[in-house]
């Protein structure tokens, strides 16, 4: 097994153990650690959100004061304290839904 494959397996296992939907959740956690792009109370839109790992992380970081919206063309299971919309992000109609959610 290549080293890169072993590392992916490590994060896949860790994601499963910690309840994240994908190992990509750790990418957002690392980016946020370095650049602080999301904080408590942040409003976040995740375009192309399937399977939802980044939505999970964004919701945990933004907390109850923030709002997180995930949009994807495919079905994504609900995530507590976040909203998921199954919609085409290239459709003009999605803009109204985003504005409506964030008010």
Task: Outline where the language-model segments fall.
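Short beta-strand element of Class I
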Residues: 65-69
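Class I SAM-dependent methyltransferase Rossmann-like catalytic core
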Residues: 1-40
